[in-house]
Amino acid sequence: MNNQTNQQSQTQSQSQQRINFDITGWEKKSKLSTQQYLLINNLNKSTQEKPLPQKYLEDKINNDIKKEENQQLQQQQQQQQQQQQQQQSPIIENFMDNFNPKTDIDNLSDFYQWYSIIDKNNPHLHQYEWFLETIVNYSKGSNQLLSMVENCDKLVESIQTDYSNLTKKTNQLNEDCEKFFNEELKLRYIAQSIHDKLKFYNQLEIQTKKFNTTNFNVTDSTFLTSLENLENSINFMKSNSTFMESNKYLTQYGFIFSRALGLIKDYISSNLKILSRDIINAQKQLKTSVSTPTSPQLQSSSGGSPLINDFSNSTDFNDLFQHSNIRFRAFAPKLRPLCLELEKRAIGPYLSYLYDTQNIYFNNRRSILSLIMFEKLQSLSKMTDISSMIRSSSLFMIQFYENEYQIYSNFFSPPDLNNNNNNNNNNNNNDNINNSTNINNSNNTNNNNQDIINNCPAFSNILDEYSQQLYDTIRPIYIHIHSFETLCNLAHLIRNELIDDLVQKSMKYSNGFKMTIERMLQDIQERLIFIIQTYIRDEIRSYHPNSDDLDYPNKLKIYVTAESTAVDGDGNGSGNSSPTLSYKSIYSTWYPTLEKSLTCLSKLYLVLETRIFEGLAQEVVEACTFTLIQASRLLLIQQKNDPYIILDSQLFLIKNLLTLREQIAPFDINFVIIEKIVDFPNLKHSLSTLYNVGSFLTLSTNNPILSLLSPRVTNTSIDSKKDLEKELKQSIESFILSNANTIIDPLLSLLTKISVFLNQSNKNQTDPMLLSQQSFADPQRIKEIIEQVKEKASNYLPQVIDRMKLYLSISTQILLMKPIRTNIIDSFDQINQYTKKYYTEDQIKIIDLQSLKLILDKILTPSKQSNNNNNNNNNNNNNNNNNNNNNNNNNNNNNNNNNNNNKNENNENENENNSNVNSPSPQQL
């Protein structure tokens, strides 16, 4: 019974569990169908879409349509779901119908009966039981899994908590380690820094002991290292002046550093003195060996100082000079490192050690070279040719400069003397001395140090001394020269050879040689100006000609004869004609003052400044013109018996003035000087008005006191070239008028009488036709006068033409003869006009005026042969003039020839264009 009871209780419990199972809830928990998922997705998409803008309204309408379609699909899906539920609901209803008893259960049999009915009617409930059991098992497993997950979660949380705690502790440990490591590094750096800084403090005792010992000197192997340590210590103390007792240590280090540099200076000084003493002793031995009585050459020399005898020949000088150079070059590698150490540290007060060392070096070189230089310059000063002496001396000085530069470069850094400025160096030194410990502490200091090393004033000073010695040796020689040609050659040599060539080579060593050469040039130019002014006064303006100087036209005839002989000799192939003879011949035709003036100008043109040359050229041209005029007058006085002396005098003046004008044309200068003259008459008037007391009170220019305090000064310009043109024009006009009047003088008197008669007839109102009845105007009388004119023209004009051929060129002859012919023809034209107006045809035939023109044309028109001869003579004259220019002015050959050719061409053109001018201008000639 108990078993049955248990079974019934179990059965009831199972039935209760079945009754409590809600199948509707399970259906709700079941998965959705595919259509349902699609519907949900469509709804999700529609909710995720953002509203469109107003401008896309049409798209929105389309979307609404799509929404309606989706709603329809949803309704269809809902209907399908309802149908499915309806399919399932009969099972549930049937189950519920079976489950609910139709009759009441009163006893156990009713229960079993009801149960059997349920069991029969619902056979598929076993499947649900199995499924329920499975679900229950899954639920238990899930619960167990959840409990395990919870345990794992708790375990993970505990692990995470432990890990975070461990991480914090590890990070803290790492930070602490890094902190301790950084502190360790910092302490080590501080310790090392302290050690490094203490090293400079500890060096003081070490260096003090080292430099105080007697065994420590410059030759010690550790000397340079100690010097660098001292320099580093000084730089450290200077850059860390805030450290304790840094100034004290800086001062002590400075004393030790100065002592070290002093040791270097003393060592170099002692070695250089020993070297110089050995070289001087060697020179004395060589001097003694050369000066022994066994040398006949030296026995004849004059006595004097034992160190200054005649051993200045080239062999002795070269031996001494080369011996000293070789010894210094061989000794340089020993001292050069120490000299470079001084140059590196030549800053502030330590610059004096470098300067002292350089001065010691130059003093030793000076003691060796003084005797050698003196003897060499004395030997050069004994040369007879001053130009060769100056050239040789300059070449020697350039070689000497180069040699000294190379020797100096073997000891010290090579100086760059092109940028040498002693004043700037002195200023830099004073600024640096104020800073007692400034050693290599900035880039600017390094630059200044390099500038000081490159700019060596002592090197320039010693070269300047020897340049001054050269100047003192040569100046007494050229200052006593009285020949201006020699002075011109010297000035030309200095300007064109020495300054342009040698001086440029010496500029990289010293400016002293350039200054010396320029001083020499200035002295020579000053001496030359003085000599030229004396020469102008004594040799040109005050020149007194002798009889040979005024032997004209014989000098010209001799020249023409010599030229014709030379031409004939060339034509016969003899080849005996000499160009030098031709040059001397053309010079012999010039008046001496003309030759001297042109020689003076050509020499001065290239050696003086333009401003100075213009003033001297004006004086020379004015003096030469004056002497030519005086010579033409003396020619008239000395040769009174010559009937053609007036003609010779005029042609002499024209020829020489033309030559002077032609020869000064190539000089591109202004022959004008401006003189300031005080108006002394005005001063005299002011002094005379001082007695008028009332005039003192006038506030005007008439006040005598104001006139005395501010005298009137007038500027007067003197143009010698214009004066020359004026004199030339006057001489040409005088020549033309005198020669024309000489021929037509009777005709001119006749014309004067005719003009007087016609004027009287006009006043008296008489018949002018009575002119032919006058005794002075009788046709026969006029014919006699014309015959006289013809005779003079036939006799006098050929003489004039012959003289002109001697003096002038063919082009100048034509220019001068045209106005003479024109004046003669004009006078005859006036007679012809009078005869046509006041004479009958028969009377005109008696007078016969046309024959005079034929005679003039025959006389004044030269033949072809004479033209050829004159052209040859003219060409020879031009060539000789050009050669004269070449000899007198070496650098203006092309200019003179071109100017002469241009002048001849211009003269020919002007001759053609001015054939109707009565008197030609000087420019036409």
Curated annotation (Swiss-Prot):
Chain spans, region Disordered: 68-88, 416-446, 863-925
Keyword Protein transport (UniProt): yes
Record's keyword terms, sorted: Golgi apparatus, Membrane, Protein transport, Transport
A Gene Ontology BP annotation from the UniProt entry: intra-Golgi vesicle-mediated transport
Biased composition (Low complexity): 71-88, 418-446, 867-904
Cited Pfam families: COG3_C, COG3_N
UniProt similarity note: Belongs to the COG3 family.
Location in the cell: Golgi apparatus membrane
Keyword Membrane annotated: yes
Domain of life per record: Eukaryota
Protein name, per record: Conserved oligomeric Golgi complex subunit 3
The protein's role, per its UniProt record: Required for normal Golgi function.
GO CC terms, sorted: cis-Golgi network; Golgi membrane; Golgi transport complex
Membrane topology field: Peripheral membrane protein
Alphabetized PANTHER family for the sequence: CONSERVED OLIGOMERIC GOLGI COMPLEX COMPONENT 3, CONSERVED OLIGOMERIC GOLGI COMPLEX SUBUNIT 3
